[in-house]
Amino acid sequence: MKKSISLLLLSLLMITPSCQKPKEAANEYNIVPKPNQIIPREGRFELSNKVRLVVPPDAPEVKDIADSLAGRLKLTAGITLKEADSADGKQAICFVMEKGMPKEGYKLSVTSNLITVTASQPNGFFYGVQTLFQLLPTAIYGKQLDKKVDWSVPAVEIEDAP
């Protein structure tokens, strides 16, 4: 009888964890605060001196934000982004205006060939670039050149808004 009760209790203990709801996926990208949506993709965007920087014309505040990204990459990675009017199928970081998005909202899309930061307002571009910084190696926050780092970004789709 004791064996039967022990066996029954052991069976119940083994079944109980399988009945629990699955836990929310961890924020594998260590982005703080956690964005509303993170969709992992395959591949990485490799940063180099061949990467183009595409910013909408007549958007000086967005250009300032793009320049802050370019300046940080120059300082810490020794990478100089080439300003261009379009990506033209080349590796590029593109800033795209999209009307109708929330003021501080943004979309960040990273593929092996293209990084796109989409927003409707400068605030959204700012937060998109802050998220991009968090996807880069921590050396991006440094004050000196670090050539030993793998300067690449994991492919991902991120969307966030307050």
Residue map of PLM features:
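Bacterial Sec-dependent N-terminal signal peptides
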Residues: 1-28
